Amino acid sequence: MYDSNNIFAKIIRGEIPSRKIVENEYAISFYDVNPMCDKHALVVPRGEYENILDFARRASAAEQAGFWDCFVKTADALGVDGEFNVFANAGADAPLFNQSVFHFHLHLIAGHKTAACMDIMKDMLCIK
């Protein structure tokens, strides 16, 4: 069940500040507070969707189009073109990365890796 008090819902409602990049009627993007690279944004639909499948199954065509428009404009605003990563986590026990905020969002990541990114990569590869 969707929790309307999650941090992204509060950001969408303006209850918590964020470093906004792009917003439209259906979505908002802002910088990740724990970036893996120097260009790390979150693109979040305004509607109440727990994960990517929930969004794909229930969002209207207008919501989906607005979300992807926000995604493209975010990439353009960050100067992202040919080399980047996009991912979404789904579920507290997802195999690689656990979903920590249960409001669907995409991570758009580009640019130079941060120390936090290098630590995560080492953990994934079991390098000490």
Regions found by a protein language model. Name each.
Residues 1-128:
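HIT superfamily nucleotide-processing domains
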